[in-house]
């Protein structure tokens, strides 16, 4: 049986519902399917949000 169904408290305030953390602005692929360039800049920008 999973902890959620047993009623255990959420000790670390982990968020399992809602929006995913990854945003399209920082994705490695563009909407047209091509690869996004400059991965270091993209990852740095993702960490500064």
UniProtKB/Swiss-Prot annotation:
Keywords, in A-Z order: Sporulation
Question: Where are the compositionally biased (Basic and acidic residues) regions?
Answer: 16-32, 39-49
Gene Ontology annotations for the cellular component aspect, listed alphabetically: endospore-forming forespore
UniProt-annotated location(s): Spore core
- State the conditions that upregulate or repress this gene: Expressed only in the forespore compartment of sporulating cells.
A Pfam match: SspK
Region Disordered: list its residue ranges: 1-49
Please indicate which superkingdom the organism of origin belongs to. Bacteria
Q: Some GO term, biological process aspect, for this entry: which one?
A: asexual sporulation
Q: Which InterPro entries match?
A: SASP_SspK (IPR012611)
Q: Give the chief site where it resides.
A: other
The answer to whether keyword Transmembrane helix applies is no
| NCBIfam families in UniProt | PRK03081.1, SASP_sspK
Q: Which family does it belong to?
A: Belongs to the SspK family.
Listed name of the protein: Small, acid-soluble spore protein K
> Gene name on record?
sspK
